[in-house]
From Swiss-Prot:
One of its GO terms (molecular function) is adenine deaminase activity. This is Adenine deaminase 2. Its cofactor is Mn(2+). Keywords: Hydrolase, Manganese, Plasmid. Belongs to the metallo-dependent hydrolases superfamily. Adenine deaminase family. One of its GO terms (biological process) is adenine catabolic process. It comes from Rhizobium meliloti (strain 1021) (Ensifer meliloti). Pfam families: Adenine_deam_C, Amidohydro_1. The keyword Manganese applies. It is an enzyme of class 3 (hydrolase). It comes from the Bacteria. Its EC number is 3.5.4.2. It catalyses: adenine + H2O + H(+) = hypoxanthine + NH4(+). The gene is ade2.
Length: 593
């Protein structure tokens, strides 16, 4: 954890002198927010007060109506006044839009700061992709604390991404002043077992005096203790209320994430048993799909849902503001108080956080749900032309085998995967997938290894009547195709290749839906409404070609099927990989008869 600090822009002597004079009553405020109710996230009070602002500073929080001398007065009658929301762990790329478009979506909803792990861009475009992410955030009304991706790829030796980040690469990123720490460390076993590469990466963060953020999915007991002792200080991969409490007790800063909505009620109950909100609990979105972002928002939606599930509204706001600011080591953020930065949200209902007006750095930047001025987008040419793969054939999606029968391994279940085994017929030199099995193929698309698809068998993925292809495929983002028919899989894959990356749904040889994502195969430079509609069409089309097998009804499972850093078998561009054992099978065929 870094020491609480005040960024240099607030230490300007003239600014401070003006603010002090205004606080004394010897000078006018630049802006006065008058007639509202301040949500005090320190005391838990909601109290009537006016807020005087000079430049980017809050100069005074004083009795309502006691001052009227200001260049601009914002009428806050009937409104609550809160610090701007801080999202402590997220990936802009998950929303499939550029940073400028993302900012225009969340700032009018009250989100003024995000902690961005651009490891999706890093996995495709390497250091250049991370540098682009940093530069693209410059000048936006949304403040971004950008982190240095720590696990590119997530499982070295088991997959090939578009780059490899060793300790030297991470140290280089940490030397950039805009980089606020090391992003989620997903190679848990590497840290726990003292792998030299991961040990050096964590040490680079500690040496730089910047936080090392975690990904502690499923860790408990001695493994959890070892992970934290190694220097990791946060986690968002919570699987239950008991897991939340155990990780609080381990001293981790918690990022309660909205992307796993089914767990939020359990977290609310767990926090209720404590009787108070620990100061190490913050909130994050992690991943928000474009249609969800367009309809529901970002961190503001997480706040609303937590309150709906029974969390005190004051606690939810404290977690999303003051606690988050302390986690970031930012003394200037997270509080409506003199001397703090004027990131301020006015909203109507404390139980249904809907922003009326948003100020960032003391300037009114959004009102009535929209930006007052559109954010300026960065150039995107460095992110184009990342599909370094030729069109594929039907045979690329078949599993070669000899004899008449084969013993094969399977990947059982979409989540918390485990090894399975079955027998399958062989015909014409190829495996005949058993009934109820789904084919998954992953083809390297970054030009750093051979691009022949590695094909495996999935159990528990329902009945498929077509194919789905995507280059959004965590975390190496190789071309991944699901389906039951090699013909449909070929059509889907080649549609995505031709589009320069993205997603396609195919049925009976016809493309039913296509979403081009030409920037790293992850993001579009189109407006949010257009991307949201395109992704919604993909969801709808996918729902027509597959009957999900309960309880796995979440389309999101497709994008995590290749996340090789998680325990259990996962298909990658090198084969079927298991990070816990280091096992890697190029083919699912064990033996033939």
């Amino acid at each position: 954890m870094t020491v609480l600090q005040q960024p240099a822009d607030l230490d300007d002597a003239c600014l401070r002198a003006r603010a002090v004079a205004a606080a004394r009553g010897d000078a006018r405020f630049d802006v006065l927010v008058a007639g509202g109710t301040v949500v005090d996230v320190v005391t838990g009070e909601c109290r009537a007060a006016d807020v005087g602002i000079v430049g980017a500073l809050i100069a005074s929080v004083h009795a309502p109506g006691s001052r009227s001398d200001a260049d601009t007065v914002i009428d806050a009658a009937g409104a609550y006044i809160s610090p701007g929301l801080i999202d402590t762990h997220m990936h802009v790329e998950s929303s499939m839009v550029t940073p400028a478009v993302y900012a225009a979506a969340v700032v009018p909803r009250g989100v003024t700061t995000v902690v961005w792990d651009p490891h999706e861009f890093g996995n495709v475009s390497g250091l250049a992709g991370v540098r682009w992410a940093v530069d693209a955030m410059g000048g936006l009304p949304l403040r971004a604390v950008v982190l240095a991706p720590s696990c590119v790829p997530s499982a070295p030796g088991l997959e090939v991404a578009g780059a490899d980040f060793d300790a030297d690469a991470v140290a280089e990123m940490l030397s950039w002043p805009e980089i606020g720490g090391i992003a989620e460390v997903m190679n848990m076993r590497g840290v726990i077992d003292g792998d030299p590469r991961m040990t050096a990466i964590v040490e680079a963060g500690l040496k730089a005096g910047k936080p090392v953020n975690g990904h502690a999915r499923g860790l408990e007991g001695a493994d959890l203790q070892a992970f934290v002792t190694a220097g990791v200080s946060s986690d968002h991969e919570l699987v239950s209320g008991d897991d939340l409490i155990a990780k609080l007790r381990a001293g981790l800063s918690i990022e309660l994430r909205g992307s796993h909505d089914h767990l939020l009620p359990e977290f609310v109950i767990a926090l209720g048993t404590l009787g108070h909100l620990p100061q190490t609990v913050t909130l994050c979105t992690d991943d928000v799909f474009p249609d969800d972002l367009h309809r529901d928002g970002g961190l503001d939606d997480v706040v609303r849902r937590l309150v709906r599930y029974g969390l005190k509204a004051e606690w939810a706001l404290q977690a999303a503001t003051l606690n988050a600011a302390r986690r970031l080591g930012r003394a200037d953020l997270g509080l409506i108080a003199p001397g703090r930065r004027a990131d301020i949200v006015l909203f109507e209902d404390i139980r249904d956080f809907r922003a009326l007006h948003v100020l960032a750095n003391g300037r009114l930047v959004a009102s009535g749900g929209g930006m007052l001025q559109a954010p300026v987008a960065a150039g995107v040419s460095p992110l184009r032309h990342t599909m370094k793969i030729e069109p594929l054939t039907e045979d690329d999606f078949r599993i070669a085998a000899t004899g008449s029968t084969a013993r094969v391994v399977t990947i059982d279940r979409p989540r918390f995967t485990r090894w399975g085994e079955t027998r399958a017929e062989v015909s014409g030199g190829y495996l005949v997938p058993p009934k109820g099995m789904t084919l998954i193929a992953v083809a390297h698309r970054h030009g750093r290894a051979d691009s022949r698809p590695r094909v495996g068998l999935l159990e528990g993925w329902g009945e498929w009547r077509g194919a789905f292809a995507t280059t959004v495929s965590h975390d190496s983002h190789n071309l991944t195709v699901f389906g039951s028919s090699p013909r449909d899989m070929r059509v889907a894959a080649n549609a995505v290749i031709e589009a320069g990356g993205g997603m396609a749904v195919v049925a009976e040889g016809k493309v039913e839906a296509l979403l081009p994502l030409p920037l790293c195969g992850l993001v579009s430079d189109a407006p949010l409404a257009e991307v949201a509609a395109g992704f919604a069409a993909i969801r709808e089309a996918a729902g027509r070609i597959v009957e999900w097998q309960p309880p796995y009804l979440v389309f999101k499972a497709c994008f995590g099927a290749t996340l090789a850093c998680n325990a259990g078998p996962h298909q990658t561009d090198r084969g079927i990989a298991d990070v816990a054992t280091g096992k890697l099978l190029e083919s699912p065929v064990l033996e033939t008869f």
